[in-house]
């Protein structure tokens, strides 16, 4: 059971985590990253993000590669990295109470995570379980 729950050990090196947060969740994302900075800084983890999330995360002192903003295709860029196997985990703090014009891209990203068996966390509790569970191995 645990083997199915955690990511394959072969992905330990060159870990690429995508981080995305809707506008109403960006502060929560920065707080989450700060709370887990020891894990993120201690391990071989590379962060990528959508554009505006990346700006906020960089201001908080994290090294991140920012892609396009979500509405301009950033979610689709991350989805492509999920599909080609270069992205190992997605942390996406969605705002389920707001409408988003790029909802089809969001749905595509989530679907591709399921298709390619990539862990996807959509809130701080599930993201903490993924990160901490991964590094307990």
Predicted regions and their residues:
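Mid-chain, well-packed structural core segment of small domains
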Residues: 74-110
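Histidine-anchored nucleotide/phosphate-binding helix
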Residues: 29-37
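Short hydrophobic/aromatic-enriched beta-strand-loop microsegments
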Residues: 45, 62-73
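Short hydrophobic targeting helices and cationic amphipathic motifs
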Residues: 2-4, 9
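Ser/Thr/Gly-rich flexible loops in soluble cytosolic domains mediating phosphotransfer, phosphorylation
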Residues: 98, 106-137
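Extreme N-terminal starter segment of soluble prokaryotic enzymes
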Residues: 14-17
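Short internal beta-strands
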Residues: 44-53
